[in-house]
């Protein structure tokens, strides 16, 4: 697992209050990890802060799974 993937999974687990083992690549924030729309906004903000990037709203809406987040961060850092 890459350093980015590990850090993303740690942030997801912390922000959504789930076990890191649940943050598998294909897990959907809303369907599998129980996030609501506010949780996903806070998650995006935490990712922006951790990786020092800005995620535009139109991109944030496309980040729906753990792998989506990992891919986005990898492409934009």
From Swiss-Prot:
Q: Pathway it acts in? A: Lipid metabolism; fatty acid biosynthesis
- Keyword terms: Cytoplasm, Fatty acid biosynthesis, Fatty acid metabolism, Lipid biosynthesis, Lipid metabolism, Phosphopantetheine, Phosphoprotein
Q: What residues bear O-(pantetheine 4'-phosphoryl)serine in this entry?
A: 37
Q: Name one GO biological process term.
A: lipid A biosynthetic process
Identify the Pfam families for this entry.
PP-binding
Matches recorded under SUPFAM superfamilies: ACP-like (SSF47336)
In the record, what terms sit under GO molecular function? acyl binding; acyl carrier activity; phosphopantetheine binding
Q: Which residues form the Carrier domain?
A: 2-77
Where does the UniProt annotation locate this protein?
A: Cytoplasm
Modification comment: 4'-phosphopantetheine is transferred from CoA to a specific serine of apo-ACP by AcpS. This modification is essential for activity because fatty acids are bound in thioester linkage to the sulfhydryl of the prosthetic group.
Gene3D superfamilies xref list:
ACP-like
What are the disulphide bonds in this sequence? none
A cellular component term, taken from the record's GO annotations:
cytosol
Keyword Cytoplasm listed? The answer is yes
Functional note: Carrier of the growing fatty acid chain in fatty acid biosynthesis.
**What protein family is recorded?**
Belongs to the acyl carrier protein (ACP) family.
Q: What is the protein named? A: Acyl carrier protein
């Amino acid at each position: 697992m890459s350093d980015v993937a590990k850090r993303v999974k740690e942030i997801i687990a912390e922000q959504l209050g789930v076990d890191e083992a649940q943050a598998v690549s294909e897990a959907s924030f809303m369907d599998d990890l129980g996030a609501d729309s506010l949780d996903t906004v806070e998650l995006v903000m935490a990712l922006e802060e951790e990786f020092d990037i800005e995620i535009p709203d139109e991109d944030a809406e496309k980040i729906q799974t753990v792998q989506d987040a990992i891919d986005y961060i990898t492409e934009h850092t």
